[in-house]
């Protein structure tokens, strides 16, 4: 998993509340258990004018020019600004996978659905909760300022606006540690690989009848 320490990124404003996981990555694209291949279909029903299908050539599909991610000024955005209850709906890790592959490192919103919130941390995507008034002000500034960037410092738990104002956010200490060090569930387990191997050795020696090759 990619570590997250500090990030400076262009902000794209998605001014919609209650964005659910089927809108983030529609159900027809969930057949793969690989973490790659979902970025081109992020927000598929909003980005394109036709109905998307798995494995099709997205470069030939008609774009919805009214959708924010298709605007030239937001190309290359790596911070998504959203409204309340982002990521609601069914549980699917494909949602943070799609956001990550598109290029987003963080999503900022007044609130998130619990399952999406948890899945994001496990996949290197930083969800940041700010007060609704702070999010409202960010929307105004982003829309009024082409090239609007935010600086996100995870160690300091701070989002810094271009005008220098610092917005503080809360994060669980364990999740913070994992993101700072790029540790997903597998990475955390591998940190104890020596202890696991030692236990397996003792277990095999004390109960050899459980193992066919003993």
UniProtKB/Swiss-Prot annotation:
EC number: 4.2.1.33
Keyword Lyase: yes
GO cellular component, one term: 3-isopropylmalate dehydratase complex
Top-rank EC class of the record's enzyme: lyase
Taxonomy, superkingdom: Bacteria
Keyword Lyase: yes
Gene Ontology MF terms: 3-isopropylmalate dehydratase activity
InterPro entries xrefs: 3-IsopropMal_deHydase_ssu, Aconitase/3IPM_dehydase_swvl, AconitaseA/IPMdHydase_ssu_swvl, IPMI_Swivel, LeuD
SUPFAM superfamilies membership: LeuD/IlvD-like
GO annotation (BP), single: L-leucine biosynthetic process
One matching Pfam family: Aconitase_C
Pathway in which this enzyme or protein is active: Amino-acid biosynthesis; L-leucine biosynthesis; L-leucine from 3-methyl-2-oxobutanoate: step 2/4
UniProt cross-references to CDD domains, sorted A to Z: IPMI_Swivel (cd01577)
Keywords (A to Z) from UniProt: Amino-acid biosynthesis, Branched-chain amino acid biosynthesis, Leucine biosynthesis, Lyase
Catalysed reaction, written as an equation: (2R,3S)-3-isopropylmalate = (2S)-2-isopropylmalate
Subunit structure: Heterodimer of LeuC and LeuD.
Function: Catalyzes the isomerization between 2-isopropylmalate and 3-isopropylmalate, via the formation of 2-isopropylmaleate.
NCBIfam families documented for this protein: leuD, PRK01641.1
Record family assignment: Belongs to the LeuD family. LeuD type 1 subfamily.
Protein name (database record): 3-isopropylmalate dehydratase small subunit
Gene: leuD
């Amino acid at each position: 998993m990619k570590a997250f320490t500090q990030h400076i990124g262009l902000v794209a404003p998605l001014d919609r509340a209650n964005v659910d996981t089927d809108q983030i990555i529609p159900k027809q694209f969930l057949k793969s258990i690989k973490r790659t291949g979902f970025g081109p279909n992020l927000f598929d029903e909003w980005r394109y004018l036709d109905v998307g299908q798995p494995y099709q050539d997205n470069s030939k599909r008609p774009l919805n020019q009214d959708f924010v991610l298709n605007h030239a000024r937001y190309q290359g955005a790596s911070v998504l600004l959203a409204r309340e209850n982002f990521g609601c709906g069914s549980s699917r890790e494909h949602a943070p996978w799609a956001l990550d592959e598109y290029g987003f490192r963080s999503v900022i919103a007044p609130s998130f659905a619990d399952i999406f919130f948890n899945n994001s941390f496990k996949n290197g995507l930083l969800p940041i909760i700010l007060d609704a008034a702070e999010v409202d002000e960010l929307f105004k500034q982003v829309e009024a300022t082409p090239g609007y960037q935010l600086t996100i410092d995870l160690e300091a738990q701070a989002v810094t606006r271009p005008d220098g104002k610092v917005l503080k956010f809360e994060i669980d200490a364990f999740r913070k540690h994992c993101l700072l060090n790029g540790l997903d569930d597998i990475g955390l387990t591998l940190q104890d690989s020596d202890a696991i191997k030692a236990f397996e050795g003792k277990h095999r020696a004390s109960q050899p009848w459980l193992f066919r090759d003993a």
